[in-house]
Amino acid sequence: MRRRVAACLVVWGCGAAADGDRVTLELANRADYLEARLEDRVLGPYVAVHPGVRVVQQNTATYQAPYRERLLTSMAAGSPPDVFQLDNIDLPALVSRGVVLDLAPYLTRAAVDIACLDQTVLSIFSRGNAVYALPRGYTPLVVVYNKDLFDRAGIPYPRDDWTWDDFLRIAKRLTRDTDGDGMIDQWGTYFDRRPFVWIPWVWAGGGDVLCPDGRRAGGCLDAPVTIDAIRWYTGWMTRQGIAPRTHNLLKSVGDAFRLFNSGRVAMMTTGHSWVPRLRPYVAAGRMRFGFVGIPHRAGVRPATAIYASGYAVPALAARRKLSIELAAYLTDSLADAVRGEAGLELPALTTAVQALVAGDTLGWEAAFVRATAVGRAPWGARIERWREVEAVLPDLLDRITLAGADPGAAAHDMARQVDRVLGATR
């Protein structure tokens, strides 16, 4: 593994060091404090063999939209970072503006073998033969479940081929009044109104929020199969009572995790970022967890979304060779292994994933890999105006779960609203 990294580093050479100049490369990402320390570990070997290069992280530790705006502002001002983290949702906007470099012509010289990457993840950052970012890591959305609650109820752990009927039956059995006060205090699942979470459930039911070309919602968001999927998903709250009412919950990002790690919710939709948060509970013997693919409607193929990030280079990079070399290093085997061990994401390199699975005694990584096999690129990686669409979609579920609207009527109204956002005509 280290030999491959070293080979990658010497291809471009150390021109800056040979000239006696110390070059500073700016690396922009959304890392928080702990993630930034992890990236420092990743960068250590690179800096060691590049004495003439200094890498400075620009850590914004912010949400995706503000990060993108800061990135676009720096590019418009002519002072972009040398390398930057590119999330799948930002790709369409940056490509359409022509501000991100197509790396494809440089990959051979940079010793990057894209055949070693997960091809679904690679496709997220590709347009035809163009490659606009080297994928760093990714996660499919899956279901995490509390094994202790399953064991107490005598319920076998779910398998990847489970259906919506299986899920509903299990969730009902795990929804309980545990203290006999007449109030439910343990729920089978958790209802999440965020589109990036619930859209994979709609896919697993055979529906979709946009039509295949991504240009309109009409005829797809309000198609019978999608309406049925939305009715089933919102029914967790409106009819089945297997999820806590969202308006009774605190509006905190950590709400869902607290409900789950306190044993009040048995199953949740989540991604790989929960792995490092759950490990301490398992290590301390406090709780046991499992991961499994999102269940599907009987007769419909399983499906989920794959969310990914990569490292890209600005089209007007001042130090193009060094920038491409750094991006290649940050997505190579050693870097992927370090991040994979930290648990924040699955590595994009298939060999790194295989090593991660082989060393995982809990079986968590294998579950994520199996889910990846039925994953697809999210809409945010395909259409530029997805942020605007995503901003209005939660209202669809709110109208059904809080205002009592009919799912069909609400979906029809939302399809018209989304079409206006996209500029489509009905």
Placement of each model-derived feature along the sequence:
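Long, aromatic- and glycine/proline-rich binding clefts that accommodate carbohydrate-like moieties
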Residues: 292, 341-395, 399
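Hinge/lid segment of periplasmic solute-binding proteins
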Residues: 88-140, 290-292, 357-361, 372
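A structural signal for short loop-to-beta-strand junctions that line the ligand-binding cleft
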Residues: 80-82, 111-149, 186-188, 295, ...
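Short, solvent-exposed loop/beta-turn-alpha elements that line the ligand-binding surface or hinge
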Residues: 104-117, 160, 179-188, 207-229, ...
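Extracytoplasmic/periplasmic solute-binding protein
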Residues: 128-136, 141, 166-219, 256, ...
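Extracytoplasmic/periplasmic substrate-recognition and gating elements
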Residues: 48, 54, 153, 235-243, ...
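Glycine-centered hinge/linker elements that transmit conformational signals in sensory
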Residues: 170-172, 215-248, 294
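Extracytoplasmic "Venus flytrap"/periplasmic binding protein-like
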Residues: 44-117, 152-154, 258-259, 266-267, ...
